[in-house]
Amino acid sequence: MKVTVLKKKGKKEVINRFELNDLAAAIQDGQMMHTVKHTREIYHLMNPHRLADGQVSTQWEGGVKLPRICFAADYQTQKGKWRMIDYNGLVVLEVNDLQTYEKAVEVRELAKKLPETMLCFLGGSGRSVKIVCRGELYGGGLPKEEEQIRQFHLNIYNTARSAYQNQFNFDIEFLEPRLD
């Protein structure tokens, strides 16, 4: 199963496609650790806020240098436009604005123990946790039509959010689940 990783190169976003296992190994091995550490050191100065397209904007020159990961689908660019190659049924829950790094680690460790969790990791701020889950249609498989994919994606996001809220015993902010 492939996911899409977007890196800013100047004013362009460059798409790279990775197998989920390879991306998980890169996160676990700390291949981005230098960039993550630098981001965490200055994050409190950045005044970050989320844009409508899902990106995080900052008032810091150069912005956040971490790549953006699209877990929901495998994309490629064709004549400058994004084209979905394959929807993979992955949804990301974001547990944001935790009080401390230690609390984020605690939430990550709890999420790792739940059978629905495919992958979880700390966000760039060190005070958030990203939890990746997968859904399937009853009987297996995934929807193929764009509108069915959007509805299915929203449904699995809401189901996952509800399940994790019950396990964590606190509210997880609703963030519109995105396919890109």
Task: Name each model-derived stretch.
Residues 98-116:
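Short amphipathic alpha-helix segments
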Residues 47-49, 75, 134-142:
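Short regulatory "switch" loops immediately downstream of catalytic or recognition motifs
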Residues 90, 114, 128:
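Beta-strand-rich binding-surface signature
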Residues 123-138:
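Short, conserved phosphate-binding/catalytic loop or strand-edge motifs used
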Residues 46, 50, 55, 111-115, ...:
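Hydrophobic, Leu/Ile/Phe/Ala-enriched alpha-helical segments that form helix-helix packing faces
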Residues 117-121:
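An amphipathic, hydrophobic-aromatic interaction surface with interspersed Lys/Arg
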Residues 1-89:
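DNA replication initiation on ssDNA origins
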Residues 3-11, 80-102, 136-180:
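DNA replication initiation modules
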